[in-house]
């Protein structure tokens, strides 16, 4: 829906970019720049920098393209936008049409891609659609992203039985565990961090995500499971870790190796392993699918932990 609503603005921004030479570098500015980095770094044909701070790199100027995601139109990105205008950078901002960021973005070399949902992923897809069309980003196919999200919404629906609902099953498994979330590819790793954030907010408990080398010590330090413990009669013990693997289908040798090491460490300590999978057809759609599945699980966990 966001891409459809911004179609005219995207076309105008593409037309404007066609009249300029390819930028020296692409700078994704503002606090929501990390998702763009995960998508663009392996693909962008020019140097790419994610700059989540409130300003721009000192070298940024008229030869560079600055892209900003501001799904809520808040002030956190306004200073970077104003600085890009002042320096004469090519600037493309995805934000609500009536907000402080849009006001600061007014300039000769600026384009605003209007969004209304306030959702970070939807706003990012709008920007990625523009970057694809100016040959600075990979194919996104917003319709396939939407289809992947619809499939997750159906599979994880509150009306779907526990036995066939992956989000409900994951939430139950996490009820007495500390989530250790891992994704192997760049986008799966980004989804893992977002899922861990959602789990922390939902439960008020620890939930960690990171590279395999950072998670292995956590799994290896877990005390072996005591098979004689009665969970109903004995005093509650410290929550044990549980490995949550976000599998986007990547078969790169390094990803396979790291997944194997994590699963072996978990098996050696009796740590439970749960896997979220997706068969969505594009990288962004797979990211969206994994993140939404994890978000559903976090919400079900929150509901399950509410005291009567």
Each PLM stretch: what is its role?
Residues 1-13, 89-97, 101-116, 120-125, ...:
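Phosphate-moiety recognition in structured ligand-binding domains
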Residues 1-19, 112, 116, 132-235:
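Active-site phosphate/pyrophosphate-binding segments
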Residues 19-154, 248-251, 261, 265:
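Glycine-rich phosphate-binding loops that contact phosphosugars or nucleotide phosphates
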Residues 23-30, 176-184, 242-247:
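Short hydrophobic beta-strand segments
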Residues 35-40, 59, 216-225, 283-284, ...:
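N-terminal beta-loop-helix "entrance" segment that forms/cooperates
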Residues 36, 191, 195, 255-258, ...:
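Residues at alpha-helix caps and immediate loop-helix transition turns in enzyme cores, especially N-
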Residues 48-55, 93-96, 205-217, 272-281:
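A generic structural motif
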